[in-house]
Structure formats: C-alpha cells, structure tokens
Amino acid sequence: MAETIEVLVAGGQADPGPPLGPELGPTPVDVQAVVQEINDQTEAFDGTEVPVTIEYEDDGSFSIEVGVPPTAALVKDEAGFDTGSGEPQENFVADLSIEQLKTIAEQKKPDLLAYDARNAAKEVAGTCASLGVTIEGEDARTFNERVDDGDYDDVLGDELAAA
C-alpha cells in the first residue's frame, strides 16, 4: 500500500537531515536515493522553497512529484530580496517589471485560478502587495487598475506560455 510524505525543500539542496530525514527514516526507502532524486528534479529552483510529494511502497520503491514554489518565494527570488516588508502598504522592498511579473505568472500557471494572462498577473500582484513589492513603480492596486484599463495588454496578451 502506497504511503505519501509531503515536504517543502530548498531546490537542489535537499539533504538527509530535517525535514526529510525524520520523515523518511522509518520508511523502507533508501533515504540517500530519495535525496538525490529530489535534488536532480529541483535543481532548476536553486535554493527556492519547493513543495515535494514522495510516494513510496512497502518494497522501498518510490516516486517523487515536484510542485511549483509558492508565489511569494518566486517573487522574492525574481526581485532579489529575502524578507517582505513589515508595513507593505507604506514601505516597499523591491520593484518588479511587467516582464518579471509575467514570468512569475507563467511559472505559477498550473496553480493559478486565472483563465488568462491579465488575471494571472493580477493574482501575482496580490502577493506583491502583501510583500511590499511595487510593479513598474506603482503599488499593486494601481497596477491592477491599469491592467483592467488595458494598459499592459501589449505585454500580457491573452495566454500565458507553458511553464
């Protein structure tokens, strides 16, 4: 009977210590093989927190499914900061270009509720607002109004590219 373990690991930097070791220790799987497979599959996310699901059988066989990092982690990575603002409506910690915002929306496409690029950009902008990140020098609310007005249609178009 298959069992499942869900963990959040730094892309390409998993090791046999916590959180993996304590979860995998009592299972029949080869911990080092699982760690190596996770690192191989997550190396593109280098250091960014990535959700990983490990499914294993009683015979020690396993499969790994890598999810998409949380939107906040992608925003922090793209903008180059570690911690969001304590007062996100007043103190801004970074600014993203519309192209950077679109890149994040494309990476998050499988997890977003949006049906087009404009709404996907607005979803990501919502996360930017809570972190204290501006978009094109404007706060997220102003940015979203401009998206609604069609100001960024030339960049956002209709569809997101496949991630």
Swiss-Prot record:
Region (Disordered): 1-26
Keywords: Ribonucleoprotein, Ribosomal protein, RNA-binding, rRNA-binding
SUPFAM superfamilies, per database record: Ribosomal L11/L12e N-terminal domain, Ribosomal protein L11, C-terminal domain
GO cellular component: large ribosomal subunit
Keyword Iron-sulfur: no
One GO BP annotation of this record: translation
The keyword Ribosomal protein appears for this protein: yes
CDD domains per record: Ribosomal_L11
One family name in Pfam for this protein: Ribosomal_L11_N
GO molecular function, one term: structural constituent of ribosome
InterPro entries: Ribosomal_uL11, Ribosomal_uL11_C, Ribosomal_uL11_C_sf, Ribosomal_uL11_CS, Ribosomal_uL11_N, Ribosomal_uL11_N_sf
Signal peptide: none
Subunit and partners: Part of the ribosomal stalk of the 50S ribosomal subunit. Interacts with L10 and the large rRNA to form the base of the stalk. L10 forms an elongated spine to which L12 dimers bind in a sequential fashion forming a multimeric L10(L12)X complex.
Task of the protein: Forms part of the ribosomal stalk which helps the ribosome interact with GTP-bound translation factors.
Recorded family membership: Belongs to the universal ribosomal protein uL11 family.
Name of the protein described by the UniProt record: Large ribosomal subunit protein uL11
Organism annotation: Halobacterium salinarum (strain ATCC 700922 / JCM 11081 / NRC-1)
Gene (UniProt): rpl11
